[in-house]
Design a protein with these regions (language model features):
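Nucleic-acid substrate recognition interfaces
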Residues: 1-138
Length: 138
């Protein structure tokens, strides 16, 4: 029997000052922009008209442009945005295979996917990557 990966989403209220709150909001906005840019590119697809769903191909097609357009959003956050877009595009591609006519993914939610490189946990606080370095949150 193989190893099963289990993922959980933890919703955590962060205690931050006003400056850190502003940086987090700007980070959320740029993360959303990054995900949308990747989704737009993947939706436009290949010359054969297929939706691009490969994370590697989407990375190659969009990474530099997304980093530039988002004023050098943290690299791990750019990759997380790409993964979010790739998952949404894969869902659309599956729906097309099933004969449905899905609409292009549109990202509006105020959330960011942090991996272990973009967030560091300590006993009493955590540090999170933002558009202007890292902030501390309790």
């Amino acid at each position: 029997m193989g190893i099963v990966e289990l993922r959980r989403t933890a919703v955590v209220k962060l205690d931050v000052d006003d400056d850190a709150h502003r940086l987090l909001q700007e980070t959320i906005d740029r993360f959303t922009q990054a995900a949308q840019m990747v989704a737009d590119d993947g939706w436009n697809g290949t010359e054969d008209g297929y939706i691009v769903t490969s994370k590697t191909e989407l990375h190659d097609r969009t990474y530099n442009d997304v980093r530039e357009a988002t004023d050098e959003l943290n690299a791990d956050l750019v990759c997380a945005a790409r993964n979010r877009a790739a998952d949404a595009l894969a869902s659309c591609a599956e729906k097309r295979k099933d004969g449905d006519n899905p609409s292009k993914p549109h990202f509006t939610s105020g959330s960011v996917v942090y991996n272990l490189n973009a967030i560091t946990y300590y006993d009493e606080y955590a540090t999170l990557a933002t558009v202007d370095g890292r902030i501390e949150a309790e």
